[in-house]
């Protein structure tokens, strides 16, 4: 299935399917799940990256177990709107994943997601260790929640 616009992704889902948000980093992949009504994003897990095949296997196991019907990948667009090498890495990951599973995928601008989450954790007086444990999956939830909150603005 091709990469879809966010509105097309939401329209492609059946009533009881969830969305899985991904924050792709070089060392980890943060995961967040929507509820079945696709209203609330919840931090779910963090995958330690190894090889693509192993990462994809773990990711698709979550997709199957949690009733996921589509993926939302954070796209790390630079502040000036330029898509640098990190964006290309996310797009390559999505293309490779699409070869393994016919599943709708959409991108969502993730600018400042990790910064916003880190700031929230600092304000909550979380320890450095605790921040390191949760920042990736919370960033994934921030990305997914952004898409869920903005669906009324889709054309």
Swiss-Prot record:
UniProt entry tagged with the keyword Nuclease: yes
CDD domains: YqgF
Xref: Gene3D superfamilies: YqgF/RNase H-like domain
GO biological process: rRNA 5'-end processing
Single GO cellular component term: cytosol
InterPro entries registered for this protein in UniProt: RNaseH-like_sf (IPR012337), YqgF (IPR005227), YqgF/RNaseH-like_dom (IPR006641), YqgF/RNaseH-like_dom_sf (IPR037027)
Keywords: Cytoplasm, Hydrolase, Nuclease, Ribosome biogenesis
GO MF annotation list: nuclease activity
Localization annotation: Cytoplasm
Protein EC: 3.1.-.-
Record-linked Pfam families: RuvX
Disulfide links within the chain: none
UniProt keyword Nuclease, yes or no: yes
Similarity comment: Belongs to the YqgF nuclease family.
Protein function: Could be a nuclease involved in processing of the 5'-end of pre-16S rRNA.
Protein name according to UniProt: Putative pre-16S rRNA nuclease
